[in-house]
């Protein structure tokens, strides 16, 4: 299941219509419909966070569905990758 399908299921389970949901996010219903139909890629981080809050879903869970690292983890991941590569170089 892709991000759009996941969000559509969650939105419907919580009783939000597409127009109401988009209005609360301050975006066009047409744009959100394209996201839910997987025509558009998942939106920018800020919109993912706002949608998660509106749906009562953990932000980390929404980013996982979008196949992204949560913004607060990005630096940690980069640091971990660099440390791993340095350790591999030392070990040869």
Segments from the language model and where they lie:
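Residues within the helices of the helix-turn-helix
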Residues: 8, 19, 49
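The alpha-helix within a helix-turn-helix
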Residues: 11, 22, 52
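Short alpha-helical DNA-recognition segment
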Residues: 15-34
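DNA major-groove recognition helix of helix-turn-helix/homeodomain DNA-binding modules
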Residues: 26, 44-61
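Short, charged recognition helix plus adjacent turn
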Residues: 61-92
């Amino acid at each position: 299941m892709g991000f759009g399908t996941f969000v559509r299921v969650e939105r419907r389970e919580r009783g939000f219509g597409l127009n109401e949901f988009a209005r609360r996010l301050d975006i066009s219903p047409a744009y959100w419909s394209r996201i839910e139909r997987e025509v558009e890629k998942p939106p920018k981080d800020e919109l993912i966070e706002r949608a998660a809050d509106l749906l009562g879903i953990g932000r980390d869970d929404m980013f996982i569905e979008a196949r992204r690292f949560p913004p607060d983890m990005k630096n940690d991941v980069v640091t971990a990758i660099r440390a791993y590569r340095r350790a591999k170089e030392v070990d040869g």
